[in-house]
Curated annotation (Swiss-Prot):
Family to which this protein belongs: Belongs to the malate synthase family.
Transmembrane segments: none
High-level lineage: Eukaryota, Fungi, Dikarya, Ascomycota, Pezizomycotina
CDD domains: malate_synt_A (cd00727)
This protein's pathway: Carbohydrate metabolism; glyoxylate cycle; (S)-malate from isocitrate: step 2/2
Cellular compartments annotated: Glyoxysome
Protein name in the entry: Malate synthase, glyoxysomal
Pfam family, one: MS_TIM-barrel
Principal cellular location given in the protein's record: other
Catalytic activity: glyoxylate + acetyl-CoA + H2O = (S)-malate + CoA + H(+)
Placement of sequence motif Microbody targeting signal: 537-539
Record-annotated active site: 168, 449
Keywords associated with the record: Glyoxylate bypass, Glyoxysome, Peroxisome, Transferase, Tricarboxylic acid cycle
Length: 539
């Protein structure tokens, strides 16, 4: 029996495998996935249990703080992260989006520096979405992704170097139920990373780039250590020098914010910086402190990047990254053009401009946009205020952020019925799309992904849990939350196309907005609705 066949013992693919998919789900690639699972899944499960234990401590009132046991790492000025890899020196504007073929072509044709191809929050992880995404990136890297849809042709431009590709894998908490090893589903992280790396790492290096990743939803430096171990094994396995991979970590949980230096340290030979994951960070803030009434936040529109706890997080991230010689990436501009209202569009674009100006002046090295039309605005601002490829020389020695700063909930604003209805509308609309296999939904001219839906349902839970009173004088309780939910779900279902899933979304949402049950992640809660493991396909 060959080594590959030995690894494939007790490996099963429980999703359909098309002829196209066979070039991705090769025996060799599946054997590599099996090795990743068998080597790292026990550690992953232990780290996920650690999250549960930490939440229990926070519920008891033990709030996060900088770790005393890693103070020596923070205090040691001598170490640095890895130098920027080819194609990652200048990252002033990054476009993000799912990995469907049309998005891949449009993103790579945009006037941006990098494209974050997303298997995570802007993709619903149906088996077809995940496998087709791998096929599309495989083809894009080899410049064979052109296709025709109806009368429209989608072709990669050839007049300049294309943006650097960065793949975002799913977070450590998500499973891929269509691929099992020894009877267990593989981690979504290892599945997404493993297939992309195995097929494309050498091809990317040959083309002057490398296997680059965005790493989401981490909650501690130990989770970064696990990624680093995965990277080392993967590079050794295919005979690639260690330190070729790069990973940019999204700091989008409040616990990770206290461990930024340690996260860079754990990944130091593979680190390409940190990113401000705005909406997930707010979600994490509400989620982690949901049992504490003094952490109740006002309407989501009042929780801007300039409120104390968000401002502190941004400043600390920039200072930390530049101290260690890696990129400090800014957050998402989620606006999409308003084509039928010039005045409203101008106002929205001015908002984008102001946000990007705040980022570049703060010292960020680049920023995110969700729509190609915003790239020119972001580029214009960064080109004007950042003439160099990045701002690592901006050290922010003036910044001294304390634990109290990161936990400062002094947020001016109010809780309104309009805010409640907006949260219901966003949560229901996003969940309904996700249940149809769409992970990126335009709502009120904003491109919403899982993070914004998470903020919406977490706020509703928090307000009901603590019985807040709206500015109109209405007490938010279970009955009130469920009444408004029913009104919104009925209205959206009536207005939506035939066969929509708003009532199903409403049934799931009802369990999340009363201040009682609270699912760790909406995506985990809904996953069984869009996963359809069947009989095993032949390997």
């Amino acid at each position: 029996m060959s080594q590959v066949d030995a690894q494939l013992k007790d490996v099963a693919i429980l999703g359909s495998v098309s002829n196209e998919a066979r070039k991705i789900l090769t025996k060799e690639a599946c054997a590599f996935l099996a090795i990743l699972h068998r080597t790292f899944n026990p550690t992953r499960k232990a780290l996920l249990q650690r999250r549960v234990d930490r939440q229990a401590e926070i519920d008891k009132g033990h709030l996060p703080d900088f770790l005393p046991e890693t103070k020596h790492i923070r205090d040691d000025p001598s170490w640095k992260g890895a130098p920027p890899a080819p194609g990652l020196v200048d990252r002033r504007v990054e476009i993000t989006g799912p990995t469907d073929r049309k998005m891949v072509v449009n993103a790579l044709n945009s006037d941006v520096w990098t494209y974050m191809a997303d298997f995570e929050d802007s993709s619903a992880p149906t088996w077809d979405n995940m496998i087709n995404g791998q096929i599309n990136l495989y083809d894009a890297i080899r410049r064979q992704v052109d296709f025709k849809q109806g009368q429209k042709e989608y072709k990669l431009r050839t007049d300049r170097t294309l943006p650097t590709l960065i793949a975002r894998a799913r977070g450590w908490h998500l499973d891929e139920k269509h691929f099992t090893v020894d009877g267990e589903p593989i981690s979504g992280s290892l599945f997404d990373f493993g297939l992309y790396f195995f097929h494309n790492a050498k091809e990317l290096v040959a083309r002057g780039f490398g296997p680059y990743f965005y790493l989401p939803k981490m909650e501690s430096h130990l989770e970064a250590r696990l990624w680093n171990d995965v990277f080392n094994l993967a590079q050794d396995y295919i005979g690639m020098p260690r330190g070729t991979i790069r990973g940019t970590v999204l700091i989008e949980t409040i616990t990770a914010a206290f461990e930024m230096e340690e996260i860079i340290y754990e990944l130091r030979d593979h680190s390409s910086g940190l990113n401000c994951g705005r909406w997930d960070y707010i979600f994490s803030f509400i989620k982690k402190f949901r049992q504490h009434p003094n952490f109740v936040l006002p309407d989501r529109s009042d929780v801007t990047m300039t409120v104390p706890f968000m401002d502190a997080y941004v400043k600390l991230l920039i200072k930390t990254c530049h101290k260690r010689g890696v990129h400090a990436m800014g957050g998402m501009a989620a606006q999409i053009p308003i084509k039928d209202n010039a005045e409203a569009n101008d106002k929205a674009m001015e908002g984008v401009r102001a946000d990007k100006l705040r980022e570049v002046r703060a010292g960020h090295d680049g920023t995110w946009v969700a729509h190609p039309a915003l790239a020119s605005i972001a580029s214009e601002v960064f080109n004007k205020y950042m003439p160099t490829p990045n701002q690592m020389h901006v050290r922010r020695e003036d910044v001294n952020i304390t634990a109290n700063d990161l936990l400062n909930t002094n947020v001016p604003g109010k809780i309104t019925e309009d805010g409640i209805r907006k949260n219901l509308n966003i949560g229901l609309s996003y969940m309904e799309g996700w249940l149809r296999g769409v992970g990126c939904i335009p709502i009120n001219y904003l491109m919403e992904d899982a993070a914004t839906a998470e903020v919406s349902r977490s706020q509703l839970w928090q307000w009901a849990r603590h019985g807040v009173t709206t500015s109109e004088g209405k007490k938010v309780d279970k009955a009130y939350a469920l009444r408004l939910l029913k009104e919104q779900a009925d209205a959206l279902a009536a207005k939506g196309p035939k066969g929509n899933k708003f009532q199903l979304a409403g049934r799931y949402f009802a369990g999340q907005v009363t201040g009682e049950d609270y699912a760790d992640f909406l995506t985990s809660l809904l996953y069984n609705e869009i996963s359809s493991p069947g009989t095993a396909s032949k390997l």
